[in-house]
A protein has these predicted regions:
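Polytopic alpha-helical membrane-helix bundles and their juxtamembrane interface segments
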Residues: 2-286
Length: 286
């Protein structure tokens, strides 16, 4: 099978997993999607007040869905004496929940006043704090993926190495003081993405497809890992844009142009982040 056909097939699987994720009929998922849409709108509109209200709700709502599914699985196990529909254990649930707690801390840090400070050093300090919290969150993702049988492959690592190097280079230009935190977090994120791309995660025991459904949540793991990289790469792009705009001393028209691009980048950061977290969490807990 050609590489193009493989990529097309994987993209279709990712779309199917996303469709399943957004059509869950559970209050926590409906609320998560609503809060995510509001967060994207707030980023585009530069509404810090709305961001401070809705963004801290995202990770708790995802965690609520994880815990709800764990309770449902436990009830089914008590009735049938087995759990044939899921490989998720209590340890997995605890790890995912802990990772979401770390991501929540990162969200709170990154929406602080330093994230839009005029001084790039203030932005760098905020970025360092957020990166530290998100590194802990990625460690949880890595632990769950390894527990589910994922392994790093040479190809997956090689494909992500240039992206990591580009991120480090961008951080060195845009936020030199945040370079250690960004480099460490970027490495953890690259490992998460590489593990999530392991095709063995898309299979059940004995090598059979996990469910046979094109919308199986495990098939959203690889796209989720890629979207996470895109989201965080755009954060660095925003920092670089701000630094270039400040050093260029653009006039009023140029400043408006920079602001418009920055708003678009900020909204895209939120959109890709909301989807990435959802796909990873669904794939890791079903």
């Amino acid at each position: 099978m050609s590489r193009r056909r493989i990529l097309t097939g994987r993209a279709a699987e990712g779309v199917g997993a996303l469709r399943r994720a957004v059509t869950r009929r559970h209050p926590a998922r409906v609320a998560y999607l609503a809060a995510g849409a509001a967060s994207v709108g707030a980023a585009l509109a530069r509404s810090d007040r709305t961001t401070r209200t809705v963004k801290p709700l995202l990770m708790p709502l995802l965690a609520a869905g994880v815990l709800h599914r764990a309770v449902v699985r436990g009830a089914g196990r008590a009735v049938t004496g087995s759990d044939v529909t899921s490989r998720t254990t209590g340890v997995d649930v605890a790890l995912v929940t802990a990772g979401l707690a770390g991501a929540w801390v990162g969200d709170v840090v990154l929406m602080g006043p330093g994230s839009r400070a005029a001084d790039t050093r203030d932005r760098a300090r905020t970025l360092s704090g957020g990166a530290a919290a998100f590194t802990a969150a990625q460690a949880a993702h890595i632990a769950v993926l390894r527990r589910r049988g994922a392994h790093l492959t040479r190809g997956a690592v090689v494909r992500r190495l240039p992206v990591w190097l580009a991120g480090v280079g961008l951080a060195a230009v845009a936020a030199p003081s945040a370079l250690p935190a960004v480099a460490g977090y970027g490495a953890a994120l690259a490992v998460t993405s590489a593990l999530a791309a392991d095709p063995t995660l898309r299979r059940g025991s004995g090598g059979a497809p996990a469910t046979g459904r094109p919308t199986d949540p495990s098939r959203g793991l690889a796209p989720g890992g890629v979207l996470f990289i895109v989201s965080d790469g755009l954060i660095l792009a925003r920092l670089a844009l701000h630094r270039v705009g400040s050093s260029a001393g653009a006039g009023a028209r140029g400043s408006r142009g920079v602001d418009a691009v920055d708003r678009l980048l900020d909204g895209t950061v939120m959109a890709t982040y909301v989807v990435a977290q959802m796909l990873l969490v669904d794939g890791e807990t079903e």
